[in-house]
């Protein structure tokens, strides 16, 4: 009560925002007369003047009044459309990183030109985000004349577009595209091996159209680029057959490999290296005279290490069991089996080969993110929609964005009738058919909104039985959809549409004459005038019939979806009528309406076909919707905390990739990593603070020699110098390994070694990151079970994910130094062969790569079907297939270069 009184006295927060923006609109309007006096050339010159002013230190906020006035004047001249004052308010809130709630028909597309122009002046790019390719193309081409008149370039990104076209589109001042494509391009850029293979140039400012759909409904939909893991079944089996021929080294005796029980590691001895190379040559897995450590044989070396570990370290009925033809891991702490979990680094496949089982090829996640996490990367994010206020709390808490409800240009005269509630579905649909028939008889156009495809098909069947001509909309063909919606305002037109179908296109009363003219083959002026005259007559008929008639066949869990349907009617001050028809058998009523309402309806003695209609019932339903919205928000908020863990890790890895790609050379990085690896290794064998009797000097020497080809006499150094402490020993080892590496550099050549370092660092980082993503998936899927042990699954997930990530970073560093110090380049063309190998891998991955959005996980982190998925719809999956490209053929990216000189070249 007190809150209501205060609001009446000082106004709501939204009222205060509108008052503040009204002053800015007055400042914009004060420039109108001066702008109207300018020639076209002078008006166009303003853009360059603004850019210079920005470079000289003026802020975009300071430039806003005059810049908005320039856009409005240019739009009037070029487009024949002048921005209303309320559109100026919408533009101001978008520039300030807020969400503008603007009713359908209020001109959101034109409104977006104001902040898009202003923010493009910085030269850092503006991304306009739409829900499908059709709207991206339509809006970009519609507004292109205005932007180009003002000297700004416009780009469009579409799926299946060549890389060069995409790069050019992103380089434009203003870029239009879909949320999916922006997200996938971000992921692909973070898989690139060269800077020139990237397409995006930074995430500066985004204007998201239908922001509620993208940032709420699809917020947690994962964007995943996946591909089948390389099928190396035959190689695993072939290498497996060689392992029994290797002998374990006992103490200091002879042998081919030794086991470090403490570190749970196994390494080949010098004799073992020679023996395995001979065996590989005999089995035609390695060419005669080649080294297993040659750069292009690293994959084979990886298989040998995996097979050796499978035979020496992992034992049946201790580490794993064989169950139903599969390897099932046994938890070393609890002794319980862990179905569905797999060891990484090829060990699981090597054990499958060892036990004579089918080697499973998995679909591997190469990169992933969610819309929620992707859009939070922008320096500034804004959005517009007809329905956002009901989700204002979520926008503020998750994205830090306030919602500004922009008033309509003309007063709203739409009639929103109370809901009609029937006892059964049959009675409800009978009433809907009757309502449609009566509205058509009056000459009113009717739009019927359904929640599912099944309901729309059932209603279509009923209308056909009554011989009512109608159109059914689905979301498969955007071009067709827009045409149907454009003409859905003709007298007596009946259109059935599911939830989201047709968003982005206004329903004009009487139909859309310009759309009709556009689809005619070279219409004469007289034909065009005739169509416009027909439209005027149709428009008058529809206005007399009360405007567009909206019928909702059921309430959704979210009031926002209901408001989207209602918002179709009453555009720009037009008349309109909306009503929802419900039944006690609808999902929302069945689940959330109390038995009291059902019993009340029965006690009223309602006859067949009678409905209950009262504002109390409508209010009770809205209260039920609020509760559901609150519950869904809590679920999304809870899940975001899980997502944030993976997102933080992704930013670290992608940041490291950026540094590798952008670095001229990695000499200092490799030196730093080498010191970190040696420090960790020494501390493993000579724990800080321990006494000398606890040190394992022979183990350290053996590991240094086996893993890093470092023949350092650690024991001798310590005997010769009593003052040599652990840190001094680390310095001595690092110095020794630096000298070894310098000799290798002289042997290979500085330029070639720099290329190999960059290539290997990216390759190792990517491989371990892919394995880490799989490990995180496995952790996520089972984490909810911790709740049964009275543990907090969220805290357990964060703790274990951190441990996994620490292990990942250590593995990457360790393997990089091991491979670089073991590397042997014996032939002049070795680096070129390495490049060719990388080209082949990249091409095969691109051919098999899938871009997909998949079902979201459950509240506890486990996988579950996506609840918003409509019956009959499948998660969107885009697959790229193509024939293999020869090295001397043009690169399929569209660069015009030969394939070997483009994708895959290590620079």
Curated annotation (Swiss-Prot):
Protein localization: Cell inner membrane; Cytoplasm
Signal peptide start and end residues: none
TM spans (from-to): none
Residues holding ATP: 87, 105-109, 506
Membrane topology classification: Peripheral membrane protein
EC number(s) recorded for this UniProt protein: 7.4.2.8
One Pfam family per UniProt: SecA_DEAD
Comp. bias regions, Basic residues: 897-907
Named cofactor requirement(s): Zn(2+)
Residues binding Zn(2+), per UniProt: 891, 893, 902-903
Keyword Translocase: yes
Keyword terms of this UniProt record: ATP-binding, Cell inner membrane, Cell membrane, Cytoplasm, Membrane, Metal-binding, Nucleotide-binding, Protein transport, Translocase, Translocation, Transport, Zinc
HAMAP family from the UniProt entry: SecA (MF_01382)
Function: Part of the Sec protein translocase complex. Interacts with the SecYEG preprotein conducting channel. Has a central role in coupling the hydrolysis of ATP to the transfer of proteins into and across the cell membrane, serving both as a receptor for the preprotein-SecB complex and as an ATP-driven molecular motor driving the stepwise translocation of polypeptide chains across the membrane.
NCBIfam families the record matches: PRK12904.1, secA
Subunit structure comment from the entry: Monomer and homodimer. Part of the essential Sec protein translocation apparatus which comprises SecA, SecYEG and auxiliary proteins SecDF-YajC and YidC.
Protein name: Protein translocase subunit SecA
The organism of origin for this protein: Alcanivorax borkumensis (strain ATCC 700651 / DSM 11573 / NCIMB 13689 / SK2)
Organism phylogeny: Bacteria, Pseudomonadati, Pseudomonadota, Gammaproteobacteria, Oceanospirillales
């Amino acid at each position: 009560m007190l809150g209501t009184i205060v609001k009446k006295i000082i106004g709501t927060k939204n009222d205060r925002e509108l008052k503040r923006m009204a002053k800015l609109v007055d400042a914009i309007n004060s420039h109108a007369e001066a702008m109207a006096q300018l020639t076209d050339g002078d008006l166009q010159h303003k853009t360059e003047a603004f850019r210079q002013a920005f470079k000289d230190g003026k802020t975009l906020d300071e430039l806003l009044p005059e810049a908005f006035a320039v856009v409005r004047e240019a739009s009037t001249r070029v487009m024949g459309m002048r921005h209303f004052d309320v559109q100026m308010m919408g533009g101001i809130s978008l520039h300030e990183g807020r969400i503008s709630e603007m009713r359908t028909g209020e001109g959101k597309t034109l409104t977006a030109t104001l902040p898009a122009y202003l923010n493009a002046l910085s030269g850092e790019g503006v991304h306009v985000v739409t829900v499908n390719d059709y709207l991206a193309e339509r809006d970009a081409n519609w507004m292109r004349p205005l932007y180009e008149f003002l000297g700004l370039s416009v780009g469009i990104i579409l799926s299946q577009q060549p890389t060069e076209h995409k790069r050019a589109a992103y380089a434009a001042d203003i870029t239009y595209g879909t949320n999916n494509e922006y997200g996938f391009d971000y992921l692909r850029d973070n898989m690139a091996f060269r800077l020139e293979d990237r397409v995006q140039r930074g995430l500066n400012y985004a204007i998201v159209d239908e922001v509620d759909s993208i940032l709420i409904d699809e917020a947690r939909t994962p964007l995943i680029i996946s591909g089948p893991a390389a099928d190396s079944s035959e190689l695993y089996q072939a290498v497996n057959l060689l392992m029994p021929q290797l002998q374990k080294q006992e103490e200091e005796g002879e042998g081919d490999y030794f086991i470090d029980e403490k570190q749970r590691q196994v390494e080949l001895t010098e004799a073992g290296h020679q023996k395995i190379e001979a065996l590989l040559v005999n089995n035609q897995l390695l060419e005669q005279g080649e080294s297993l450590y040659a750069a292009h044989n690293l994959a084979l070396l990886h298989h040998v290490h995996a097979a050796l570990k499978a035979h020496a370290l992992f034992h049946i009925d201790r580490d794993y069991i064989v169950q139903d033809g599969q390897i099932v891991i046994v938890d070393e702490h609890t002794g319980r089996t862990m179905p569905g979990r797999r060891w990484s680094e090829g060990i699981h496949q090597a054990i499958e080969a060892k036990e004579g089982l089918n080697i499973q090829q998995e679909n591997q996640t190469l990169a992933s993110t969610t819309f929620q996490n992707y859009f939070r990367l922008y320096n500034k994010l804004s959005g517009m929609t007809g329905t956002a206020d009901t989700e204002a709390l979520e926008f503020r808490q998750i994205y830090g964005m306030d919602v500004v409800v922009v008033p309509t240009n003309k007063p709203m005269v739409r009639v929103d009738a109370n809901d009609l509630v029937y006892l059964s579905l049959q009675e409800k649909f009978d009433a809907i058919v009757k309502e449609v028939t009566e509205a058509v008889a009056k000459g009113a156009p009717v739009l019927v909104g359904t929640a599912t495809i099944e309901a729309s098909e059932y209603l279509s069947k009923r209308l056909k039985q009554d011989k009512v001509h109608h159109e059914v909309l689905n979301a498969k063909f955007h071009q067709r959809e827009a045409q149907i919606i454009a003409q859905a305002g003709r007298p007596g037109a009946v259109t059935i549409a599911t939830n989201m179908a047709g968003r982005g296109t206004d329903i004009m009363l009487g139909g859309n004459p310009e759309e009709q003219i556009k689809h005619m083959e070279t219409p004469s002026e007289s034909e065009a005038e005739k169509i416009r005259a027909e439209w005027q007559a149709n428009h008058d008929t529809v206005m007399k019939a009360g405007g567009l008639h909206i019928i909702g066949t059921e309430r959704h869990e979210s009031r926002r979806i209901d408001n989207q349907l209602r918002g179709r009617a009453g555009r720009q001050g037009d008349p309109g009528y909306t009503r929802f028809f419900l039944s006690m058998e609808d999902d929302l009523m069945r689940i959330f309406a109390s038995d009291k309402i059902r019993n009340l309806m029965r006690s009223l003695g309602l006859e067949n076909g009678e409905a209950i209609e009262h504002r109390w019932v409508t209010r009770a339903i809205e209260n039920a919707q609020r509760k559901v919205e609150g519950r869904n928000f809590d679920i999304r908020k809870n899940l975001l905390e899980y997502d944030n863990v993976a997102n933080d890790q992704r930013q670290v890895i992608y940041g490291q990739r950026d540094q590798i790609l952008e670095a001229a050379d990695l000499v200092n990085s490799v030196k730093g990593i080498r010191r970190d690896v040696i420090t960790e290794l020494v501390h493993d064998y000579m724990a800080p603070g321990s006494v000398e009797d606890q040190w394992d000097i022979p183990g350290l020497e053996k590991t240094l020699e086996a893993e890093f080809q470092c023949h350092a006499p650690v024991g001798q150094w310590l005997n010769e110098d009593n003052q040599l402490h652990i840190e001094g020993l680390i310095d001595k080892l690092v110095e020794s390994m630096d000298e070894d590496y310098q000799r290798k550099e002289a042997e290979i050549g500085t330029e070639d070694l720099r290329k190999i370092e960059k290539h290997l660092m990216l390759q190792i980082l990517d491989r371990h990151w892919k394995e880490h993503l799989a490990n995180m998936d496995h952790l996520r899927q089972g984490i909810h079970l911790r709740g049964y042990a009275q543990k907090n699954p969220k805290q357990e997930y964060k703790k274990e994910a951190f441990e996994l990530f620490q292990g990942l970073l250590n593995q990457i560093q360790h393997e990089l130094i091991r491979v670089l110090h073991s590397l042997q380049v014996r032939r002049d063309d070795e680096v070129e062969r390495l490049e060719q190998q990388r080209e082949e891998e990249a091409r095969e991955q691109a051919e098999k790569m899938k871009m997909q959005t998949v079902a979201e996980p459950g509240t506890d982190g486990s996988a579950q079907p996506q609840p918003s998925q409509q019956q009959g719809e499948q998660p969107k999956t885009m697959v790229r297939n193509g024939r293999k490209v020869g090295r001397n053929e043009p690169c399929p990216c569209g660069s015009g270069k030969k394939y070997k000189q483009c994708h895959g070249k290590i620079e």
